[in-house]
Amino acid sequence: LLSGGTTGIPKLIPRRHCDYIYVAKKTTDRCNVNQESVYLASLPIAHNFPLGCPGIMGTFAKGGKVVLCNVTSPDEILPLIEEEKVTITGFVPAIANICMDYLEYEEYDLSSLEVIQVGGSVLEPWLAEKIEKVFDVKLQQIFGIAEGLILTTNEEDNDKIRWQTQGKPISEHDEILIVDEQGKIVGIEEYGELIVRGPYTIYGYYNLPEVNETCITQDCYFKTGDKARKLKDGNYQIVGRIKEIINRAGEKITPLELEEILLTHENINSVQVVGLPDRLQGESIAVFILNGDKELTLEEVRKFLISNNVADFKLPDTVKYIDAWPLTALGKIDRNKLKETF
């Protein structure tokens, strides 16, 4: 497989067959997949998530049925769930949102659905709650990297854990550390970079020694590039890619923090915050908002953030409205394409 390529050039990932078998077994146990299960592969199957978490491999291993989706689109996904009596499927947040919008105009019998897995990018708590209510299912958050590590929530977890965390590692042999910029371990509930080693995580990319020198530690931990923290109950929260963190005149801004506040505004249904190159500050803050009934000015957005106690250095420099989000092949919002619109 190739790495996602959302923050750089895709890299070849040397994975073993036994890695995929191991992950499929562990994730089928987490999802209670059995011979009665019907899995809908709604995302492109050349990715870890629909391929084997538990996905196609895990469902077949348990004797269940797999349904393939020709196009990742609500007018393909929702009819298939109804016709094939799908019990489990996986979405990225953007696709989940699009499907829910579609359900406002079209009706389908989705009563067979038991579990919806959501992964691929950060899932905001309000959207997690909405998914459970609209689809009347138990949500399973899943965080994974093509290079190995998989975290998931459990069906028995309470609402707060399912909506606000990405759960725990699937293997008792996964070794996870949260470290600062100097590689020192941070305390519980402190943010840092998630690094990992374990039975199904790679020890380097294929034929890229210069890259491996920067992404593998001396004691063989893989640097995921994800900003995260470990909670007291052992669950993990992932807040985004470290490369997505905006460095504005030396101040660090996490996009998710601003996005969560902006989504509480009555006229904002979907938003992305990205950093743009700036000669004076290094990076400036841009807010992209999906077109709705009313457009807000930059001044209105800034005033709203100030009313929510956002510090001055985190206030955006520009606001731009957009008709539709540019998506990667896996359905993630393509932040690089957003930057190219300026």
Give the location of each predicted region.
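Short beta-strand->loop structural element characteristic of the AMP-binding/adenylate-forming
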Residues: K11-P14, A41, G64-V71, Q140
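Glycine-centered tight turns that cap/initiate beta-strands
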Residues: S112, D136, E172, N267-S270, ...
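Gly/Ser/Thr-rich phosphate-binding loop
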Residues: V86-F91, M100-I161, S171, E175
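AMP-binding/adenylate-forming catalytic core of the ANL superfamily
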Residues: I81, T89, G144, G198, ...
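Conserved S/T- and glycine-rich ATP-binding loop of Class I adenylate-forming
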Residues: L2-T6, Y39, I81, T89, ...
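Conserved AMP-binding/adenylation subdomain of ANL enzymes
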Residues: I21-V38, N48-I88, Y102
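Conserved ATP/PPi-binding loop(s) of AMP-dependent carboxylate-activating enzymes
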Residues: P169-H173, K184-C215, I253
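Conserved AMP-binding A3 loop
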Residues: L1-Y22
